[in-house]
Amino acid sequence: MIDVQTKQTYSVSKTHPDGIFRIDDFNFLYNCNVYSYDTILFKYAGYDTRGFIDAQLQYYLKLNQPCNFETPSILNHYARYIADCNVLGSLVSLPKHEDIAYDLFERIYVAEKQPGLDFYQNQLLSAFYDIEKNGIQINPTKFTEAFGQSFSVNEDKSYTQYNYYTTTGRPSNRFGGINFAALNKDDGSRDCFVSRFENGSLVELDFNSYHPRLIASLTGYDFGSEDVYEHLAKHYHDTQTPTKPQILQAKESTFRQIYGGISKQYLHVPFFKAAKELAERLWYFAQDHGYIESPVSGRKLILANYQDITLYTLFNYFLQMYETEFNVLTLKPIQDQLQNHKTVAVLYTYDSILFDVPSEELDYLLKEVIPQSIDLNKFPVKIKKGITYSEMKLC
């Protein structure tokens, strides 16, 4: 521990063999501003972290980049030569721990509370922690066939770990050598993920045409009750009855325009005209003020933190930040309604959420929780259900 005013270091311990001042909670610090490098790790260790300030998150919100603090060489040394030891920290002397902590403090400490901290720490970190701790039930044999041995597995569950500190603001999800954000749909590897409940099922909530609809929510554009890409195909091809190939082409063109920049030839389409105006408003605001601000969290994307950024790169960063924060606003009420139930969210992948559901709670999830948590007129969803993650069928 470090007193940020005096820079004095202290050692408190729960299990270290040299610890004199041993603790089981941090109640003695509740009247202080407590900065922790990673509040989620403290939560996994069983500590109450209410009132803590996540220093890593503060750093990220200020600089829009992660703190790349390398694991100290002494811990790497022990990890290499005593690979099966799960108490490596106890092998390092307390004075050395203090040195490591002070080095980290010097690199990461940001005193001023950053815009967006309350939302990111109290809602975003909490929402993804609640998913991580549930794990995904696996068939051990099929899991090993698909992924080999992985330290992500414990008691027939594979655990995930979200990394929030990305350039775009979209959490990545790679843990134990597995990229859970991009599991292959075609090679059978998803077949190892199953329900933890007897006669249970995996249920996937998948947002339709998510980014166009997010842009529509920001601009006031109304797709009505139409499929987004059918709606846009009518404008692309000047027809009220677009063909399936025309709708598919509209989908491909829409992705290119949103992520690569909107071409003049598409500005006759009202949706793209509105999207371009939004991108330009954000860009001009950033040029004048040096940042743009999230309408959800108040987080600032600071222009000086990005080298050679363009109008549409900034627009994409803004859109992915908004997507993530909007998803948290969706996740939290769902998780709140499931608190006293067996159903759990087990995986989040940008525009979809995977649930593990016992048979007796399926109707509750589909007919009560989801409709009460999502405006299905503005954000329609597809619901798929399966015994394994590779056998999902539309409900």
Segments the model singles out, each with a brief description of its role:
Residues 119, 126, 138-142:
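Long, charged/polar-rich coiled-coil alpha-helical scaffolds that serve as structural arms
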Residues 124, 144-146, 256-257, 271-273, ...:
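A glycine-rich phosphate-binding loop feature that marks nucleotide/adenosyl-phosphate handling sites
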Residues 1-73:
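Conserved RNase H-like, two-metal-ion catalytic cores of nucleic-acid enzymes
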Residues 2-25, 140-244, 295-338, 342-358, ...:
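Acidic, glycine-rich two-metal-ion catalytic cores of nucleic acid-processing enzymes
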Residues 375-384:
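Interdomain boundary/hinge elements
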Residues 114-117:
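Acidic, low-complexity, intrinsically disordered interaction modules
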Residues 390-395:
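Short, low-order "capping/linker" segments at domain edges
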Residues 44-46, 54-112, 124-134, 176-179, ...:
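Helical catalytic core of nucleic-acid polymerases
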